């Protein structure tokens, strides 16, 4: 089994130049006045693919959203890419399917994955 955080972390590494970072939910700690008390730096775990491979995958996933199976996920005003998935549900009768989509934006400098 794979958790959503594991899937998201792995996917983000593919569009982040191949860099796999430890997942985190906090980037800094502030006081009541908004002053930074502590910055929480990202922790690089490893490289999953080369930057060249990452750049190629981003272009493929951009095409998926602009003219492929992920075109219904396109959001006007955003340069985004993504990956679609389809699986048959049991019983496999050719009617019941589970569909999925995971995406990122912007394509040139990904800031969001989900």
Predicted regions and their residues:
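Active-site beta-strand/loop architecture of penicillin-binding DD-peptidases
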Residues: 1-44, 52, 61-114
């Amino acid at each position: 089994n794979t958790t959503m955080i594991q899937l998201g972390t792995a996917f983000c590494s593919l569009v982040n130049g191949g860099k796999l970072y430890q997942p985190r939910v906090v980037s800094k700690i502030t006081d009541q006045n908004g002053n930074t008390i502590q910055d929480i730096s990202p922790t690089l775990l490893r490289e999953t693919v080369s930057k060249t491979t990452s750049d190629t995958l981003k272009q493929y996933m951009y095409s998926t959203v602009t003219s492929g199976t992920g075109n219904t996920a396109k959001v006007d005003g955003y340069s985004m890419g993504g990956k679609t998935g389809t699986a048959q549900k049991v019983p496999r009768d050719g009617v019941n399917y589970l569909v999925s989509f995971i995406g990122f934006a912007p394509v040139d400098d990904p800031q969001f994955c989900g």
